[in-house]
């Protein structure tokens, strides 16, 4: 008897299949907050809209920066072969964390390049933008990276259009700054696929009260973080933090806030207990 193929309604079809490439010392919080909204979305939808698998450079289990060991399903070489068959994913995210500057696995860089060349979306979680840039994928592309890594990243990859935002989506390249910013980026992805109603329901399950915009600040407001109230000092620090990659001279900073260099030095010493040069 001829078997009639079972037709799956469009609303119940798989939306995205993802590979998470974990590298040594990857950020557990970025990894978990990227996967969990997808899991919650699947549960609320009642079907598998998102499917994922884990990989590491060698295919062996890998340690996060918090010491937790994670088992993976395959190696980079296996995932490179999967690009040629029906296991080809629709997105690949590389998840890294501290000491990303030391990561130099050529096979991983080649895999990310091949993935991108085949029109598959690629992304970086936490410091993953560093690895994407090392693979040659971020020239003239907007990207986000953790604020702590931004100065070094700007110096190492001057052609990357890096921003101190929570996340950036530039065509088919997705990057986020790490921490809980991965949650916001994935919620944006879910919203694109299924609309705001599902996003709101995922937020309710995750006990988060809002979806942050991509351009929201990474760090606490200066007043709260530093306990400083003087508007001129806050303006000076905002200028400094906006120009970490290419620091401005104190003369230029003074000019921007309409004070003399001497006034800025006295004010900074009074309010911060140190010179502008020591802070910057």
Predicted regions and their residues:
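Structural detector of well-ordered beta-strand residues that form the stable sheet scaffold
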Residues: 122-123, 144, 163, 174
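Acidic/polar active-site rim loop that often engages polyanionic ligands
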Residues: 130-138, 182-185
């Amino acid at each position: 008897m001829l078997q009639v193929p079972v037709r799956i309604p469009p609303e119940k079809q798989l939306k995205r299949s993802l590979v998470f490439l974990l590298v040594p010392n990857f950020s557990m919080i970025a990894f978990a907050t990227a996967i969990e909204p997808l899991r919650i979305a699947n549960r609320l939808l009642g079907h598998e809209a998102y499917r994922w698998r884990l990989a590491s450079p060698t295919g062996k289990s890998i340690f996060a920066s918090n010491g937790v060991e994670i088992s993976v399903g395959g190696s980079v070489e296996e995932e490179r072969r999967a690009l040629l068959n029906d296991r080809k994913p629709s997105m690949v995210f590389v998840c890294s964390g501290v000491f990303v500057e030391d990561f130099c696995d050529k096979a991983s860089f080649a895999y990310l390049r091949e993935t991108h060349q085949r029109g598959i979306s690629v992304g970086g979680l936490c410091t993953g933008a560093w690895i994407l840039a090392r693979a040659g994928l971020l020239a003239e592309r907007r990207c986000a990276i953790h604020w702590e890594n931004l100065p070094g990243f700007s110096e190492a990859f001057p052609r990357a259009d890096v921003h101190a935002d929570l996340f950036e989506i530039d065509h088919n390249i997705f990057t986020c700054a790490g921490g809980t910013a991965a949650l916001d980026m994935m919620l944006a992805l879910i919203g694109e696929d299924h609309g705001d109603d599902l996003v709101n329901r995922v937020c309710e399950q995750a006990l988060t009260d809002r979806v942050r915009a991509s351009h929201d600040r990474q760090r606490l407001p200066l007043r709260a973080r530093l306990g400083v109230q003087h508007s001129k000092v806050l303006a000076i620090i905002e200028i400094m933090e906006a120009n970490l990659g290419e620091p401005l001279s104190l003369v230029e900073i003074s000019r921007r806030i309409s004070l003399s260099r001497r006034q800025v030095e006295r004010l900074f010493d009074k309010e911060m207990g140190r010179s502008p040069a020591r802070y910057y």
